[in-house]
Amino acid sequence: MIEADRLITATGQDREEQQDRAIRPLRLAEYIGQPVVREQMELFIQAARGRREALDHTLIFGPPGLGKTTLANIIAQEMGVSLKSTSGPVLERPGDLAALLTNLESGDVLFVDEIHRLSPVVEEVLYPAMEDFQLDIMIGEGPAARSIKLDLPPFTLVGATTRAGMLTNPLRDRFGIVQRLEFYSVADLTTIVGRSAAILGLPTDAEGAFEIARRARGTPRIANRLLRRVRDFAQVRGEGRITRQIADLALNLLDVDEHGLDHQDRRLLLTLIEKFDGGPVGVDSLAAAISEERHTIEDVLEPYLIQQGYMMRTPRGRVVTRHAYLHFGLNLPARMEATMADPLADAPADGE
């Protein structure tokens, strides 16, 4: 899949897990960015500790790579309890969930990543566990089947998802705390890169950290991945120190430009400009033109480009914006100049 091969994908990669664990903050005091979330969670955690109660069930949602797993770990550390981790797709049967719940100690945190992918039958078992700290278990089969209730110790369920809209209403309503993580500012990412470099023992100038941060698409996971690749460049072709010049040379070699766009992003935009006169064009035609699957365009390439204003969806299809032409140093076509006089002509919508 194209996303797994991209340096700037926000999706986690298995080989990075051990490296990320080494630089992951463990306390709210070390947590950089997300000031509103940090302040609220500090308040909720202090209140729960003061009452000697388990923290309310917490839902964390937002784009991938922004620190949902990190925040779950911090919650457990701040509460002084153990963390048990799993993910929605892993919990295939009610018994899988029951095995986890019955092994929790009082106050423990159960972290469920990709919670929107829970199966309906598992979700039904989770409702009474979250609300009443009880587990309903069916024993036997057929006419002899009977239900028994098991009491569970108070625990905190922390659910993480990139697609909060896919959660069912009954599940969403059972979370007492709901937090949305936003993309990070370049200033916060610069601080994160500097902190990670210090932990990894990498001499890094402030300008070098800034150069990495501004190409990281607002995402700490991408920033840390770029840092590791720039480290390799500095080790082989530099003197081991990450300066602005070294970071710029390394990231240009890796084909990540100053706005965080890579070859796939630029190919999509240039195809729209050169082959379809800037659009509008249907997503299937666009997919055929760049030899990619439709879902790859919709789920992998488009979101960041739309968010940054390089392209948009209209009732007639995909079109590039003035911002895309300026990014490539191209003159605006006469048609686009005329369209800009009527801003409603290409009003954003979910066109095909």
UniProtKB/Swiss-Prot annotation:
Q: What does it catalyze? A: ATP + H2O = ADP + phosphate + H(+)
Binding positions for DNA per the UniProt entry: 294, 313, 318
- Does Nucleotide-binding count among this protein's keywords? yes
The residues listed in the UniProt record as binding Mg(2+), with positions renumbered to this chain, are 69
Q: Name one GO cellular component term.
A: cytoplasm
One Pfam family here: AAA_lid_4
Output one GO MF annotation.
ATP binding
Protein localization: Cytoplasm
Q: Which CDD domains does this one have?
A: AAA (cd00009)
Determine if Zinc is one of this entry's keywords.
Answer: no
The EC designation for this entry is 3.6.4.-
Q: Which portions of the sequence form the region Large ATPase domain (RuvB-L)?
A: 4-184
| Superkingdom, natural source | Bacteria
Q: Which UniProt keywords apply?
A: ATP-binding, Cytoplasm, DNA damage, DNA recombination, DNA repair, DNA-binding, Hydrolase, Nucleotide-binding
Region (Small ATPAse domain (RuvB-S)) location: 185-255
User: Which InterPro entries does this UniProt record tie to the protein?
Assistant: AAA+_ATPase (IPR003593), AAA_lid_4 (IPR041445), DNA_helicase_Holl-junc_RuvB (IPR004605), P-loop_NTPase (IPR027417), RuvB-like_N (IPR008824), RuvB_C (IPR008823), WH-like_DNA-bd_sf (IPR036388), WH_DNA-bd_sf (IPR036390)
One Gene Ontology BP term is: DNA recombination
Where are the stretches annotated Head domain (RuvB-H)? 258-352
Residues that coordinate or bind ATP: 23-24, 65, 68-70, 131-133, 174, 184, 221
Similarity annotation: Belongs to the RuvB family.
The record's listing under HAMAP family reads:
DNA_HJ_migration_RuvB (MF_00016)
PANTHER family tied to this protein: HOLLIDAY JUNCTION BRANCH MIGRATION COMPLEX SUBUNIT RUVB (PTHR42848:SF1), PTHR42848
> What is recorded about the protein's domains?
Has 3 domains, the large (RuvB-L) and small ATPase (RuvB-S) domains and the C-terminal head (RuvB-H) domain. The head domain binds DNA, while the ATPase domains jointly bind ATP, ADP or are empty depending on the state of the subunit in the translocation cycle. During a single DNA translocation step the structure of each domain remains the same, but their relative positions change.
Subunit info?
Homohexamer. Forms an RuvA(8)-RuvB(12)-Holliday junction (HJ) complex. HJ DNA is sandwiched between 2 RuvA tetramers; dsDNA enters through RuvA and exits via RuvB. An RuvB hexamer assembles on each DNA strand where it exits the tetramer. Each RuvB hexamer is contacted by two RuvA subunits (via domain III) on 2 adjacent RuvB subunits; this complex drives branch migration. In the full resolvosome a probable DNA-RuvA(4)-RuvB(12)-RuvC(2) complex forms which resolves the HJ.
Q: What does this protein do?
A: The RuvA-RuvB-RuvC complex processes Holliday junction (HJ) DNA during genetic recombination and DNA repair, while the RuvA-RuvB complex plays an important role in the rescue of blocked DNA replication forks via replication fork reversal (RFR). RuvA specifically binds to HJ cruciform DNA, conferring on it an open structure. The RuvB hexamer acts as an ATP-dependent pump, pulling dsDNA into and through the RuvAB complex. RuvB forms 2 homohexamers on either side of HJ DNA bound by 1 or 2 RuvA tetramers; 4 subunits per hexamer contact DNA at a time.
Query: What's the protein name?
Result: Holliday junction branch migration complex subunit RuvB
Native source organism of the sequence: Azotobacter vinelandii (strain DJ / ATCC BAA-1303)
The beginning of the lineage is: Bacteria, Pseudomonadati, Pseudomonadota, Gammaproteobacteria, Pseudomonadales
